[in-house]
């Protein structure tokens, strides 16, 4: 078990928490980052690219000139791809770029990402963070005290006030624990977890 300090919002130590080595202090596998992030970015692609082929371009139903005895190359339609205004040959079509990554791989990559932030000393665990109202300036001061600018803040459940406070900061964002993913961890410079969130992640990733 690995021990981590738990802080209040003024960066004063208020206790310690023990978390599984396998989740927060394991081996970092960068290839898993590559696989999971590539899949995430692929699934984000809209895939709506499209062009008109000769069957979709209007007109061109009539043969432009007779087949023989004109001295010109034979043509069947003015909408063939070699004509100006014709359809595109073998152009892009709408497609779905997303593909599945095995659940075990996703979990292993998430464990690696947590271990990486822990090794870099960019993982901060706070006792709790439940603002009464959304206030960006207050969130900015807390992150500055925690030494976690451009941070991803994760709470055990949806926290509307905290989400609105943090998301308005340049380079920072908020996620509920169930939405935590490798891409967002790597995208931000630091990771801030509540103690409850850390225990939830330990249970789900062990």
Swiss-Prot record:
Question: InterPro entries annotated for this entry?
Answer: Ribosomal_uL4, Ribosomal_uL4-like, Ribosomal_uL4_dom_sf
| Biased composition range(s): Basic residues | 63-72
Lineage, top-rank taxon, reads Bacteria
| Residue segments, region Disordered | 48-98
Keyword Lyase annotated: no
Keyword check for rRNA-binding, yes or no: yes
Example of a GO cellular component annotation carried by this entry: ribonucleoprotein complex
Q: State any GO BP term from the record.
A: translation
An annotated Gene Ontology molecular function: rRNA binding
Pfam families (UniProt xref): Ribosomal_L4
Cystine crosslinks = none
**Keywords from the UniProt entry:** Ribonucleoprotein, Ribosomal protein, RNA-binding, rRNA-binding
Function field: One of the primary rRNA binding proteins, this protein initially binds near the 5'-end of the 23S rRNA. It is important during the early stages of 50S assembly. It makes multiple contacts with different domains of the 23S rRNA in the assembled 50S subunit and ribosome.
Give the family from UniProt.
Belongs to the universal ribosomal protein uL4 family.
Complex and partners:
Part of the 50S ribosomal subunit.
PANTHER family in the record: 50S RIBOSOMAL PROTEIN L4, LARGE RIBOSOMAL SUBUNIT PROTEIN UL4M
Query: Matching HAMAP family, A to Z?
Result: Ribosomal_uL4_B
Q: Protein name, please?
A: Large ribosomal subunit protein uL4
